[in-house]
Amino acid sequence: MFEMYIESGMNKLRCGYTTGSCATGAAKAATMLLFDLINSEEELNEIEIDTPKGIKVEMPIDHVVVGKNFVQCTILKFSGDDKDITMGLEIQATVEKISKEEAEELSKKLISNESKIIVLDGGIGVGRVTKDGLFVAKGEPAINPVPRQMIIKEIESILPKDKYVKVIISVPQGTEIGKKTFNPRLGIEGGISILGTSGIVYPMSEDALKASIKLEIKQKSLKNKNLILTFGNLGENYCKSLGYIEEEIIICSNFIGFALECCVSCKVKSILIVGHIGKMSKIAYGCFNTHSRVCGVRLEVLALELTLLGYDVSLVNKVLNEKTCEGAVKLLGSGYENLYKNIGKKILNSMKTYVYDELKIDAVMYYGASNPILLWSSCLE
């Protein structure tokens, strides 16, 4: 069993392996069994693969199905201490013997290696790409370039001479799980993606989230140079209630600065940021990672702006004693339009400074979770 750890502060966190590694291991194991490259099925309890990181990964084989001309192996996705949505998913590879003629014909429409002895496709639960701008061409299975290379390389290393195989990667629960990932937003339908650039899942996968944000901006900016940035599902729903459509909305989580940088690099012309005052107030004073562990100022922004407007210190203290911005807004009640306007203008100035005025920027700020209520919008100025 694969055991690798990284240090995170005072904690020791266990790494896992990607869906790409699972697919590779399952495909290699199935090929070995199909061509009797081991003594018996019982002997193959684990499979070892090389990863692009140069780290060897051993994975247990969950179960095997042997047919007349095919073998199917299943490996369970293991995410280590990064408990993502794919943890425990069955990743299956079915490897089938085919003729040279079949391989040549299939290679015209499926993924294949240079010598056309291996053809590769996605089965049930592996998404299909329906839009341009991704790492995989429109119409192809969502098996990313590195996992493709890994699968082909491992099979090439063991496939007997003058033998040809068709490899199908499937994820039985992938159709449902795929709906809960970024895939529908990216135009990947019908399942999950087979991913991984290193073969290893590292806990605290901030990089993976950023990569998804970058990819979504790249893909959506191909057809739309005016995008909407928001922080999460609540913001997305509010955007839709305002009439915006999914094709122009980007969920950037806490990484607003990173998302702005991606918009600039993708030649986006304008962005509208839509967010709850709790997140937006942080941007007003230059915080472009809005996670509470990175920046906790929210009530302090409201308190400072109230002070600058000349409000009594007793009111300022009441705001500071609230637990959330939501509570502070409700405490204040109506009649504080200038407060939200001043914060809003500072949000715009802060963002424009961040991108060196390379983007036209507007902002919408609201409060309320179940029923968002507009506090300020530069679009109405």
UniProtKB/Swiss-Prot annotation:
Species annotation: Clostridium botulinum (strain Eklund 17B / Type B)
Reactions mediated catalytically: Co-precorrin-5B + S-adenosyl-L-methionine = Co-precorrin-6A + S-adenosyl-L-homocysteine
Family: Belongs to the CbiD family.
GO biological process, one term: methylation
Root EC class: transferase
Pathway annotation from the record: Cofactor biosynthesis; adenosylcobalamin biosynthesis; cob(II)yrinate a,c-diamide from sirohydrochlorin (anaerobic route): step 6/10
InterPro entries according to UniProt: CbiD, CbiD_sf
Stated name of the protein: Cobalt-precorrin-5B C(1)-methyltransferase
